[in-house]
Amino acid sequence: MRNRRFISFLLVMLLGGAACSRSAKTKKLDIVLVTKALDSEFWQRLKSGAEQAARQNPEVRLAVLAPEREINIDQQVAILEDQILKRVAALAVAPAGVAEIIPVLEKARAAGIPVLIVDTDIPWPHRAGFVGIDNRLGGRMAAEFIVRAIGGRGKVAVIRGVLGVATQEDRLAGFLDVIQKVPGIHFVGAQPANSERALGMTVMENLLTRHPDLRAVFATNDQMALGAMEAIAARNLTGKIVLVGFDAGREAVRAVLDGRMDAVVAQFPERIGERAIQEAIKAARGQPVEKFVDIGTGLVTRENAHEFLR
């Protein structure tokens, strides 16, 4: 009898241990990527890269969330607050603002949730790390191309994204680093179009009306560049105004290939998304995270555009 009881006890312990082992194996690591929006090819490609990283780690359950538009900072704050309440394992965030976002990131820190910053760096010392590009360098690349294309003379404008967003400020600053050193170039200003195509078209139309002798335009993302391209085409000025974009989505690259745009600064959103989740997983596990990961940039011109369409 005593032996039977002992055997029963062992079976219970073994079965219980197996159940615990299965539970430990099936426990998911909840990682949440919060972007500025998902309404453009850039963010969709970044999302795709993040999902690829999650597929390579079966224990990870990834959610990708975003406000409707990049200017909807309040929506991003609400999304982050909701995920903090859910006690997720780690957050990867592309901040839509600075002053508005840092307080909610502090809430995540207080809850013990590591936060990796993606795409748009911010002056927050408690981030686990950053994954993105050197946007100032990208702005310089655009300016150097324009200076060569117009022979260092003429009026130049910038169509820029949301005011105060670090990526946009850095791209503009890099552009001005170069342009302001060229005596023959007259910089007529930077006009915001909130990274939106329709607004980019409107801003370009206004620039053409105000400056009919405009020689070149740098749009700090693809969507605004494509809108500007449409405004230029509507006035039969394609090929007469140098147009440079930023991001290198497929539509923009095709526009460079067929001569409707002149160049586009390339970043690699799939790589950014994939590396961001890889680093977020490390942070969730308490492992060391790289503090600054620069994915790198390139310049798409008519000569190499086909390489970016593979």
Residue ranges and their predicted role:
Residues 76, 131-156, 199-201, 249-252, ...:
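Hydrophobic alpha-helical segments within soluble ligand-binding/sensing domains
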Residues 98-137, 145-148, 155, 247-262, ...:
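Flexible loop/hinge segments that line or gate small-molecule binding clefts
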Residues 56-69, 155-158, 179-197:
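Short beta-strand elements in bilobed, periplasmic/extracellular small-molecule ligand-binding domains
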Residues 159, 163, 167, 178-179, ...:
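Hinge/cleft segment of the Venus flytrap/periplasmic-binding protein
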Residues 42-56, 60, 138-142, 166-185, ...:
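Short, solvent-exposed amphipathic alpha-helices that sit
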Residues 20-23:
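Bacterial signal peptide processing site
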Residues 90-109, 175, 188-189, 193-254:
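Hydrophobic alpha-helical
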